[in-house]
Amino acid sequence: MGDKWIGAALSDPLRILASPLVILRRDDDTKTLENIESLVKTHQPDLLIIGLPISLNGTIGPQAEKVKSFSELLSRHLNIEIIYRDERFSTDEARRKMNDSGKNNKTVRDDAAAAAVILQDYLDETNPPCCQP
């Protein structure tokens, strides 16, 4: 969640695979809340995974505080649980995956692809492996 753009991703119903969904322009808080509320009404997620821009040394800086402040407002407004995930290197990982798949920034913007990386990290960590040998 940046100052200008918010990338959104969505999981499949089995919570196995995350896919980029949309990029929202970050206007004023009211308009941004309305746009996110529309996505939540359409897709009906159980919770929101929000990337937290933790600094490279692992501390919570001013940008992370801004994200947390807006996320708390979002949680109250939508009555939905928020889970924070470290978003360090998510854009780099998204760009690498886009390059590996032959997609470029004109096909999928970094913001939505990075959101999918963050969500996929959460899914991989919270879901047990589907198939055991």
From Swiss-Prot:
Its EC number is 3.1.-.-. It comes from Dehalococcoides mccartyi (strain CBDB1). SUPFAM superfamilies: Ribonuclease H-like. SMART domains: YqgFc (SM00732). GO terms for biological process: rRNA 5'-end processing. The keyword Transit peptide does not apply. This is Putative pre-16S rRNA nuclease. It is found in: Cytoplasm. Pfam families: RuvX (PF03652).
